[in-house]
Amino acid sequence: MRCLLYLLFLILLFAHCTTRKTSLVWEQNFPVIGSQSSPRTIDINHDGTDDIIMGACKNEYISNDQAVLALDGKSGNLLWTTDAPDQVYGSATLVDITGDNNKDVIISGRWGYLRALDGQNGKTIWNYTYTDSIDPILKHTKFNFYNSVLIPDQNRDGIEDILIQNGGNHRAAPDDSIHRYPGVLMVMDSKSGKILAADSMPDGKESYMSPLYFKSKNGIDYIVFGSGGETYNGHLFVATLTDLINKNLKNAKIVATDASGHGYIAPPVAADFNNDGHTDIACISHSSKITVIDGNSLSTLWEKQIPNTESSNSFSVGKYNDDNIPDLFTFVSKGVWPQSTGSVQIALNGKDGSLIYTDSLGCAGFSSPVSYDLNNDGIEEVIISINEYDCNRGYTSESLLQITNKLIAINLKTHQVQQIDQTNGFKNIYSTPLICDLDHDGYLDIIYNQYYSHNYDLLSFLGMRIKRIQSSVKIKENIRWGGYMGTLNNGIYK
């Protein structure tokens, strides 16, 4: 069933004084598979239109011949694909490894999956292999890899290297305290996959968080990482990259903690929230405790608890009110995982945590928001994916599931909700949409994923659809938060 494109951009059409219409450029359907990944873009075939890279999967523990997908941005046709033994849920890190002036792909997934792929053809450059069961740190690096971020070249080969977290025994039941092993933060050579440094979480706890790297105003290479999970408490840490290189994460400072039986899962973000020229840090715990940390003193600027909710969703960062301080948007889940029963959207003033906007649209999900000023009024709209069904059934119910997936834009000035797309019988639990200028024509494009809902199981896969929507919105300012972990794919707002 083809999507229904609604008139989100009809008002924008007149506001931007253009005759261009919003339209569906293409949709590509894949049977059997789904995805927990979010799209990234590179121009693979050098036709002037960026192409799409994303991970894909079947259900857990099942191998897949189409585990990483490269799609032509013009047509949606498959350019290349590669296999994996389990789910590839990471979103790609893009860096030229081979020296051919084309970006290559580093992408992660479940049970130790981490590969570097030639961006031109998908051939494996290197593949992580778990080999060390004796080393007290590396023996725990057989679990899940999360999104990597680029860091400065550490081994003087002229190529940026990667910072990445391994952890999370997915076979451990929610109440299992025995089979939970310390997460391991790693620096790896992006060219060869060699481990350059690794150390365990300072508190010895598990980790599911993609790390953050930034260089401070004072020239310090900071790394930010978290511990804990849905049912076990944890901390957010800040350390220097040198601490990790020296295997000395015990020097890390705890900058946020959650003692309520929840850890830190969603990736943190970085922006200047107090206008002092220093990069600050914002994080959200699984119990929906939001903390903003001063990047100069590493002290708390403000905290806000969203009661009776949980969160594994990261933020979008943008201009959501009239001041000049970046603000935060996310959505959190009502109820207790895995019986999450609804979703709450919140926008917070980056300066003090005061509420700009809240609503309760759709049911729970794990994707994240993106934002752009669609109507040129100086305040960014937020674009999110929501699923509408009987939210009270939770994730594990075996009751009948009638579901509709929607892509919507929220006007944070008027609180109006405008619908971009709706598809009945489809869902999107995990994937964050991408907004970009795919063909560099000066107009906003949207890349968006949906998954066929074939039975009662919200989390299973049996077919996916990827869409490119061409909008009538003329790009007048840089897209500053256009995808998962931001436009730069690194969690930093600039």
Where are these regions (language model features)?
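Bacterial Sec-dependent N-terminal signal peptides
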Residues: M1-K21
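Beta-propeller-forming repeat regions
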Residues: C17-K494
